[in-house]
Amino acid sequence: DLERAGKRHAVITGVVEGGDPGVQAEIEDWCKAAQVRRRFRDTNIAQIGRPYPGMMDLYIDETNLYNRMFLYTKQFDWEKMWAIADDITDEDAIRAKAQEILDTFDIEGGGTIEKVWDMAKYVVAFEKWVKDEHLGMIASHYNGFAQGKAGVLDSMLIPAFSMLIKQGTACAVEGDMKVAMAMSILKTISGTGQLSEMYSIDFNDDICIIGHSGS
């Protein structure tokens, strides 16, 4: 019937009762795949700014993505982000988030709530935005003047996205939506999904310098 209806399907052959490890492994794989599909269907992906200039493989067909994965794309400008931050006035929430930041990061020279206050405000703003827009994935790239509010925002992106990744929201740099989706898939099927880049490799000393890119 599935064949005649044109529905894609798979058949698992084996014995469930008695603990057939092969059957159990196949069932678990299909369950993980279903979890990924459900996560894509039940959340949205956001793109802030535009993809990194010159990297044309980063652009995607939003219509095709929705038709295949039921994943809806929401486009945002950076002005939206600092506008949200301007509306954050709950000092108790900011203070609690500042303490969470201090508990999460090792800050060179020592950190205080006062030192990370602005950072905490932006993290609270980003968390509110993720909740309001029902986001599971974010791809961003800032290519503007790092002055005024824009400069403050630019300096807050890595810690803000790091905190979101910690909470399970996939955040990719360079506006790479495909990497954001890959991070989300890894988070769903294996418990964590991180983004890193190899900046330099010393073959003589067998050293590889890896940047965390927000994770």
Describe the residue ranges of each PLM region.
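Cap/lid and interdomain-hinge subdomains that line or gate substrate/regulatory clefts
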Residues: 1-98, 102-105
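Anaerobic metallocofactor- and corrinoid-dependent redox/one-carbon enzyme cores
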Residues: 64, 68-72, 118-215
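Hydrophobic alpha-helical scaffolding
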Residues: 17, 51-55, 84-87, 109-116, ...
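Conserved active-site and cofactor/substrate-binding residues in soluble primary-metabolism enzymes
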Residues: 18, 22-25, 40, 56-60, ...
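A near-ubiquitous, low-amplitude feature marking generic local secondary-structure context
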Residues: 28-31, 48, 109, 121, ...
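Active-site loops and adjacent core secondary-structure elements that bind or stabilize anionic groups
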Residues: 97-127
